[in-house]
Regions:
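Activation on beta-sandwich/Ig-like modules and their edge loops
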Residues: 1-146, 153-154, 160, 193-202, ...
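Divalent cation-coordinating acidic motifs and surrounding scaffolds
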Residues: 60-63, 67, 73-76, 139, ...
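Hydrophobic residues on conserved beta-strands that form the core of alpha/beta folds
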Residues: 4, 35, 289-291, 465, ...
């Protein structure tokens, strides 16, 4: 439940440190509290007949156990800014007397007495302070001034009596990220308190002390991070006997650089918070101490021993199942049974891995993934294969480092390389990779000399058709990107006869000015291929409607056919446009498209804010071939496999299933007209070979997914969160028959990439 946690009206007044008044809300409940359509309102301490409530509308939500900061009017004095507020208004609160209400709705209240306000069902919570006549309970909260706020007592006390529930003290504004104002933290503790880290962490994912201030928590500093989410980790050198309770915790210092050092013995006073790095995306939370006051007792102390994470102690089952539609947050941790519980029981503690294989290359954020469990299904080139929703690979672990890369270069690793020796550091949680080892010491990098693949040389009688997602290619990209992509087409793909491209942007890239033409983008790429020794490709495409096909805003990404006119001809049939639906005409050998190029059912709801399939009719040695270039909707909005929701929701899957159903019906219509039709459907389908979308595409055998015909260890085209997986596919109709298919691994496993997808090529004999 949401309550008003703190009120301060002295901002910018004489003697004040803070520049602004503020109202701080808190969520005492176990679920998010939505604030859309709500408001905070203020009225003077002694309202008259003409007094009006001032209103600040709110948006968003308060995650369980966190705060929500509303900045109000600024005064002329003060030297310290509030932490970044979650909402802002212009209410000028009195420093000594007034009333604040949390209201369902944004219409001003009309009540001016305590009784009338108590009777108004829109009022969720109310705080009167100073001599305010509108308050909860026997009296208003006392002690507010230019240097003192009124804040709820321990546990966010809420007995509906302002005088009893709130007390005056130094203002301590805290936002939803747990950030506090500079200089607003109290003096460090001098004696250990009664609460230990394992008491804070508890035996579930959420601390039972969330929202409470804990004093004098002892620990040894095991890691310090001075960039990004700044702070440090502490660990109790005297653990309890419960394997479910972590002995480590992150201390969040907000915008302030931490001043402690690894090996310091410290006492920390701070507020227990649960920080969700991606709440709306379903992430789990990180238990942390915010707004800390720290006392260093001694330095140079030995660190608590690191827990080695490996095949011996990582459970084989990834996660417990939550109640229908619910989360695993309240379930007791079973670290011996479930992988996610095992990692949660080590949250904030020192862990280590030894001689681990890199399963996702170093990225631009200076992070990589390793395989802590050597039993996960290995790909042919050293990654781990994602083969089903039920088997997400338990040993995947992200590795970052505590030191900034400018201070300590991060290893540039490819898949299959090895971090030899020991890599150790605290176990963190973030919204991009889940549980993450933030290394203080990194193992030495052993280069496995991974080579970029080159597809087989085709025979002259083979038609080669390829697909390549070129990742938002636009004329303004560096010439080096065009050159690298082009060289791959010529060398690694051996200049395919037909090349279906995805993510070709319009002529001015990600600029929203109505431009949809991509002729300059394509011309620059075609020229780069020719310069790299490739053929003089011709091309066909259809410009989308502005802003209707998703992707990077302003970019208007689309699919494009490149084809080598010396090897294959394109059958141009007028009538194709962004909004016109292609159909099938004729029967038997006379079967043809009604437009070439054309788009499949562009007005169907399946393609809302997504790329429509581009279909073209080609001729190779007198044989007709229909090619469909695809780019299905992305997985944006899906909950991660490490989500607090188990099983995680795959909301984007619904649209891809609709898209697959529409396309399958089109192919079925082609085959009904000509059962011997040669159809190749390929591209970035943004889904797995075991997904409902691919099952729908291959329904009734109208298409077969060639990735399933590769050796199991070669079935991947993309690497995400340490999983080598299939997002790109080539599918063919039954009469294609002979089909030699290859995923050409040149990008996804490498730190240096021209694109994040691997291209694919198929050789057929129409």
């Amino acid at each position: 439940d949401a309550v008003i946690a703190e009120v301060y009206g002295g901002g910018g007044n004489s003697g004040a440190t803070l520049k602004n008044d503020f109202i701080e809300l808190a969520n005492k409940g176990g679920a998010a509290f939505g604030l859309d359509g709500w408001s905070v309102q203020y009225i003077s301490g002694t309202p008259g007949a003409n007094s009006q409530w001032g209103v600040t509308p709110l948006t968003g939500a308060i995650a369980p156990g966190t705060r929500y900061l509303v900045a109000e009017a600024a005064g002329a004095a003060g030297t310290v800014d509030l932490p970044t507020p979650d909402a802002a208004g212009s209410l000028a609160l009195s420093g000594t007397s007034g009333t604040v209400a949390l209201v369902r709705g944004t219409d001003p209240l009309t009540c001016r007495t305590a009784a009338d306000c108590a009777a108004d069902p829109r009022v969720r919570d109310l705080v009167g302070f100073g001599t305010a006549v509108v308050h909860e309970g026997a009296a208003a909260a006392a002690g507010a001034s230019n240097t003192a706020s009124v804040a709820r007592k321990a546990g966010l006390a809420d007995t509906d009596d302002n005088a009893a529930d709130l007390a005056a003290g130094a203002p301590s504004p805290t936002n939803s990220k747990g950030e506090v104002a500079e200089g607003s933290t109290p003096t460090g503790p001098t004696e250990p308190g009664t609460v230990r880290i394992h008491d804070i962490q508890g035996t579930t994912r959420l601390s039972s002390r969330t929202g409470k201030t804990v004093a004098g928590v002892p620990g040894i500093v095991t890691g310090v991070r001075g960039y990004g989410s700044k702070g440090f980790w502490i660990q109790d050198p005297n653990p309890d006997a419960d394997p479910a309770t972590s002995e480590g915790v992150f201390v969040y210092t907000g915008s302030a650089n931490p001043t402690v050092k690894v090996g310091d013995s410290v006492l920390v006073t701070g507020k227990v918070t649960e920080y969700y790095p991606n709440f709306n995306g379903g992430s789990q939370s990180l238990t942390q101490l915010s707004g800390p006051a720290v006392t260093v007792l001694s330095s140079g102390n030995p660190l608590p021993a690191a827990v080695e994470v490996d095949t011996r102690n990582i459970p084989g089952t990834y996660t417990p199942q939550a109640p229908a539609g619910g989360t695993v947050e309240s379930l007791p941790l079973q670290p011996e049974k479930y992988t996610l519980d095992f990692y949660e029981s080590l949250e904030g503690m020192r862990v280590q891995v030894k001689d681990v294989r890199v399963i996702q290359a170093t990225d631009k954020y200076n992070e990589l993934w390793v395989a802590a469990d050597k039993q996960d299904q290995k790909s042919r080139r050293g990654g781990v294969l994602y083969e089903s929703y039920e088997e997400p690979n338990v040993g995947r672990l992200m590795v970052q480092q505590q030191a900034p890369a400018a201070q300590q270069p991060f290893p540039v690793a490819n898949v299959g390389d090895v971090l030899t020796g020991t890599t150790d550091g605290p176990l963190d949680y973030n919204g991009f990779g889940g549980y993450t080892l933030v290394a203080g010491a990194l193992g030495a990098l052993q280069d496995n000399h991974l080579a970029r693949e080159v597809t087989a040389q085709p025979a002259d009688r083979e038609l080669t058709i390829a697909t390549y997602n070129v990742e938002n290619l636009a004329p303004g990209n560096p010439d080096a990107k065009f050159a690298e992509l082009a060289q791959a087409v010529v060398t690694n793909l051996r200049s395919p006869d037909v090349l279906a491209l995805e993510e070709i942007q319009d002529n001015n890239g990600a600029k929203s000015d109505g431009t949809v033409d991509a002729s300059q983008t394509v011309a620059k790429f075609v020229a780069a291929i020719k310069a790299a020794g490739g053929p003089a490709y011709d091309w066909r495409s259809i410009d989308p409607e502005d802003g209707k096909d998703g992707g990077e805003p302003g970019g208007n990404i689309r699919q494009v056919f490149l084809f080598n006119p010396q090897r294959v001809s394109f059958t141009d049939i007028a009538g194709g446009s962004a909004t016109a639906a292609v159909d099938v005409a004729g029967t038997g050998a006379a079967t043809a498209l009604t437009a070439s190029p054309g788009r499949i059912a562009p007005a169907d709801e399946a393609w809302v804010n997504s790329r429509k399939p581009l279909v073209g009719q080609f001729s190779f040695r007198g044989k007709k071939v229909f090619v469909i270039a695809n780019h299905f909707n992305s997985k944006g909005g899906d909950q991660g496999i490490d989500s607090r929701f188990q099983a995680p929701a795959r909301s984007s899957e619904v649209q891809r299933l609709k898209q697959a159903t529409v396309e399958q019906a089109f192919v079925a219509k082609l085959l009904a007209a000509d059962k011997e039709a040669k159809v190749v459907s390929l591209g970035d389908f943004n889904d797995y070979q075991f997904s409902p979308a691919l099952a729908a595409l291959t329904k009734d055998g109208v298409l077969r997914d060639l990735v399933n015909e590769l050796p199991e260890k070669e079935q991947y085209s993309y690497v995400y969160q340490g999983n080598s997986q299939v997002l790109d596919h080539v599918l063919v109709s039954p009469e294609v028959g002979y089909a030699k298919y290859d995923v050409v691994h040149i990008n996804s496993e490498f730190a240096v990439q021209a694109s994040d997808h691997d291209p694919q090529v198929v050789r057929i004999k129409p």
